[in-house]
Amino acid sequence: MKKNRLWVLFALLIIALAANGYAEENYKIGVLAKNGPVKALQMWKATGDYLTSKIPGKTFEIVPLGFNEVYPAIESGKISFFLANSSMFVTAKVRYGAKAVATMVNSRQGQPLKYFGGVIITSDANDQINALNDLKGKKFMAVQESSFGGWQMAYKALLDAGINPYTDFTKLDFGGKHDNVVYAVMNGVVDAGTVRTDTLERMASAGEIDMADFKIINPQKFNDFPFACSTTLYPEWPLAKVKSTSDTVARSIVDALKQLKATDAAAKSAKVVGWVDALDYAPVEALQKTLKVGAFMAAK
C-alpha cells in the first residue's frame, strides 16, 4: 500500500513538473498599437493563435503596446518578441541587442508589399501649399516623434529640401494616431500633415474620407507601389526577438510564419500576404543617424 502511494506521489510530481514546464513556454509578443489596443488585438491575436497551433509545447500571446511602452517592455523582459515600426526596431537593436527575424509582407489593394513610405498631405482647396518649400511658416501635424512612417520619413524629406520643421513651421503638433492627422488636415486644424502610406487609401475604402479632398505634396512614383507617397521607401515592419530569447525559438517562429498563406485567418486579420526572412534595415539606421533620432538621439 505504501509503495502504491509512493508511485502515486511520484506520478503527481511528474505531472506537476511537466505542467510547470509548459507554463514557462508562454511567449509574449509585443505589438505597436498605432491605432489603439483594441484594433491591435483584432489584427494580431489570430497570429498568436496560429503560432500556438503550429509550434508544439509553446503558446504565444499578443500584447498591445503604445509608442511609449515598447522600449520599457523590452528592457523589463515583459515580452520575448515584438512587432514595431522599422525605426523603433533599429533603436531596440542598438540599445538592447534586439534582432530582426522576419519582415511582414503587407497586403494592400491586392499587392504584396515589403516596403512603405510616408505621405505629406494638405487640403485640395489649399492653393498656398503645392510643394515642400511652401510648408515654411505653416501649421503641421505628424503622428508621434517616434513614428517612422508617420513622422521620421517626412522629417528626412523636409531636411533634404532645406526645411527644418522644428524652426521653419509656425506650429508642429503630434496627433497620436494616423487617422487623427488626416482629420486635422481635413478639418483645417492644421495646414498640412504626414502619415504612413496606405492610411489615406484605407480610410477612403472605409468611407471615412474622400481622397479627392486631399493634395499630395512632393509625390513620388515607384514601380509596383500603389499608394500615394512623398518619401523614399523603407522596409516594412520586422518581427524581432529580444536579446534573451533563444535563436531556436525564433527560428521555429520564422519557419511557421513563412508557411502562413494569404488565405489563412491570421493573414487576413493582420492584412498581410505573409512573411519573409528579415530584410536589411541599414537604410533605417542611416536615417536615424542623419536625423539624430532613436538610438542616435543627441543628449539633452
Feature-to-residue mapping (PLM):
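Bacterial N-terminal signal peptides that target proteins for export
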Residues: 1-8
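Bacterial N-terminal signal peptides
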Residues: 9-18
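Pocket-lining segment of extracytoplasmic ligand-binding domains
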Residues: 139-248
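Boundary at the C-terminal end of the N-terminal hydrophobic targeting segment
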Residues: 19-23
